[in-house]
Amino acid sequence: MKQFIDFIPLLLFFIVYKLDPRPMEVAGHHFEFGGIYSATAMLIISSLVVYGALFLRQRKLEKGQWLTLIACLVFGGLTLTFHSETFLKWKAPVVNWLFALGFAGSHFIGDRVLIKRIMGHALTLPDAIWTRLNLAWIAFFLFCGAANLFVAFTFQDFWVDFKVFGSLGMTVIFLVAQGVYLSRHLHDDPSTSKPKD
């Protein structure tokens, strides 16, 4: 459910982006609805609405949601201010690499890697498995960031489709692979430090 809520602004961005640009007037202001810039405005507005509603309901946002919202406001705002989609193309790579940095930093800060802090309440695994899983997430975020950057600046007509559905597809595949891997270790003795091959 949480993943679906996080996906709403991106889906609205995609829908508006795919519309043929058409002139509109609201309260005496003329603008073009459809295309990259109105889609960016929709992304900003819908992100504020979605995360604002979550904050009012839960009295908090997760760190990843704060990062996503701030990146949306910064890169989306720069895109609209300078009328250049280049800024928006950097959003997904930067967010993914910041996530990778956060997961990597947890190996040196605190007594548990980040993935264990996130999932440790639901799963009991040896520390070696948590470490390996955390490294997998670091690699995943680095790859997603690089893939988004490559597609955004190489395939101009395809990058929005990839941003929405390519990233989602990679995430689903990774989560399935993680589930298969974890299923092999769910009954491991947590005191054991050596993972299965």
Curated annotation (Swiss-Prot):
Major place of residence: membrane
The record, for NCBIfam families, names: ispZ (TIGR00997), PRK00259.1-3 (NF001325), PRK00259.1-5 (NF001327)
Can you name the source organism?
Answer: Pseudomonas putida (strain ATCC 47054 / DSM 6125 / CFBP 8728 / NCIMB 11950 / KT2440)
Q: Where in the cell is it found?
A: Cell inner membrane
Question: What name goes with this protein?
Answer: Inner membrane-spanning protein YciB
Q: How is the protein disposed in the membrane?
A: Multi-pass membrane protein
Transmembrane region(s): 36-56, 64-84, 90-110, 135-155, 162-182
Report the sequence similarity comment from the record. Answer: Belongs to the YciB family.
Question: Corresponding gene?
Answer: yciB
Q: What does this protein do?
A: Plays a role in cell envelope biogenesis, maintenance of cell envelope integrity and membrane homeostasis.
